[in-house]
From Swiss-Prot:
<keyword id="KW-0521">NADP</keyword>
<keyword id="KW-0460">Magnesium</keyword>
<comment type="pathway">
    <text>Amino-acid biosynthesis; L-isoleucine biosynthesis; L-isoleucine from 2-oxobutanoate: step 2/4.</text>
</comment>
<feature type="binding site">
    <location>
        <position position="191"/>
    </location>
    <ligand>
        <name>Mg(2+) 2</name>
    </ligand>
</feature>
<dbReference type="InterPro" id="IPR014359">
    <property type="entry name" value="KARI_prok"/>
</dbReference>
<feature type="binding site">
    <location>
        <position position="51"/>
    </location>
    <ligand>
        <name>NADP(+)</name>
    </ligand>
</feature>
<keyword id="KW-0100">Branched-chain amino acid biosynthesis</keyword>
<dbReference type="GO" id="GO:0009099">
    <property type="term" value="P:L-valine biosynthetic process"/>
</dbReference>
<keyword id="KW-0479">Metal-binding</keyword>
<feature type="binding site">
    <location>
        <position position="227"/>
    </location>
    <ligand>
        <name>Mg(2+) 2</name>
    </ligand>
</feature>
<dbReference type="GO" id="GO:0004455">
    <property type="term" value="F:ketol-acid reductoisomerase activity"/>
</dbReference>
<dbReference type="InterPro" id="IPR036291">
    <property type="entry name" value="NAD(P)-bd_dom_sf"/>
</dbReference>
<comment type="similarity">
    <text>Belongs to the ketol-acid reductoisomerase family.</text>
</comment>
<feature type="active site">
    <location>
        <position position="108"/>
    </location>
</feature>
<dbReference type="GO" id="GO:0009097">
    <property type="term" value="P:isoleucine biosynthetic process"/>
</dbReference>
<feature type="binding site">
    <location>
        <position position="195"/>
    </location>
    <ligand>
        <name>Mg(2+) 1</name>
    </ligand>
</feature>
<dbReference type="GO" id="GO:0000287">
    <property type="term" value="F:magnesium ion binding"/>
</dbReference>
Length: 331
């Protein structure tokens, strides 16, 4: 069973004499920095002088310096920029200041898991990964609650890495809900698999295939959109709130019978075997090497595939239908 830590298991005193640098001020960066500050932690935000986020951070009363200056000052350096930027930021701004006794922290394990960043000996390496977007991490913190987090320690040079990680988790509100102990490997591999096979890749492909099946059979694209994309949120919300069983309890008997008898015909053993292949590529580094090479080469294939996806008929149909829905229509 997983170890779960709560407020009583974490002590903010472990951050009392430590300066924290949050590198980045995006979704997670702004939440971490503001929550830590409100928890009494000495925090600064590291952003390039050309960053448009500098003004946003300063407006929130945060001290903003360059990533290099933040890394030089801080005892704990948390990197919260996109994965593909980590290597450059680390090499140019962090590594020169990563002296023994400091801690390097991450919100996702990708670069450590695949050896893209190799911290020196004498440095603690830990991860605190909220299981929710930054705006939620900030909002519930202000409400006196918290979002669950994953906590992992990759290197414990000081013998205090877990204590520091838990203190950090408490500082952003994570231990109010619970901090689940994991590893960089487990967090990275399961996160990538979930994105690729279920949450993003799997769900997107399933929705498109269902839409195509109905339209090719002669049904109107607008009705197909409602049945295969729009109503997905209704089902996912039920699953999110109470699990699959609660979702099945909440739908009609006809829908439930179709679920339990036809669902396995869609997600067949062959589909599950393909999921296993995807997991294998994550575990053996194939996906990471492919993605890093694609990013380094300028993302031509990636961009092409994304643009092709935008041309799918379901996008045009949705663009026409969503303005009908006042609760989701955008200005």
């Amino acid at each position: 069973m997983v170890e779960i830590y709560y407020d009583d298991d974490a002590n903010l005193d472990n951050l009392a004499d430590r300066k924290v640098a949050v590198i980045g001020f995006g979704s997670q960066g702004h939440a971490h920095a503001l929550n830590l500050r409100d928890s009494g932690v000495d925090v600064r935000v590291g952003l390039p002088e050309t960053s448009t986020s500098r003004a946003k951070a300063e407006e929130q009363g945060l001290r903003v310096v360059t990533p290099a200056e933040a890394s030089a000052e801080a005892d704990i350096i948390m990197i919260l920029t996109p994965d593909t930027t980590h290597r450059k930021i680390y090499a140019e701004s962090i590594a020169p200041h990563l002296t023994p006794g400091k801690a390097l922290a991450f919100g996702h394990g990708f670069n450590i898991r695949y050896g893209l960043i190799e911290p020196p000996a004498g440095v603690d390496v830990f991860m605190v990964a909220p299981k929710g977007p930054g705006h939620l991490v900030r909002r519930v913190f202000v409400e006196g609650k918290g979002v669950p987090v994953l906590v992992a320690v990759e290197a414990d040079a000081t013998g205090k890495a877990l204590d520091i990680a838990l203190a950090y988790a408490k500082g952003i509100g994570g231990t109010r809900a619970g901090a689940l102990r994991t590893t960089f490997t487990e967090e990275t591999e399961t996160d990538l698999f979930g994105e690729q096979a279920v949450l993003c890749g799997g769900a997107s492909a399933l929705v498109q295939a269902g839409f195509e099946t109905l339209v090719e059979a002669g049904y109107t694209p607008e009705v197909a959109y409602f049945e295969c994309l729009h109503e997905l949120k209704l089902i996912v919300d039920l699953m999110y709130e109470g699990g699959i069983s609660q979702m099945r309890y909440s739908i009609s008997d006809t829908a439930e019978y179709g679920d339990v008898t036809r669902g396995p015909r869609v997600i067949t053993p062959a589909v599950k075997a393909e999921m296993r292949k995807i997991l294998d590529e994550i575990q053996d580094g194939t996906f990471a090497r492919e993605w890093v090479a694609e990013d380094d080469a300028g993302r031509a294939t990636f961009t092409k595939l994304v643009e092709e996806g935008k041309q799918h008929p379901i996008e045009q149909v949705g663009g026409k239908l969503r303005p009908m829905m006042s609760w989701i229509a955008k200005d």
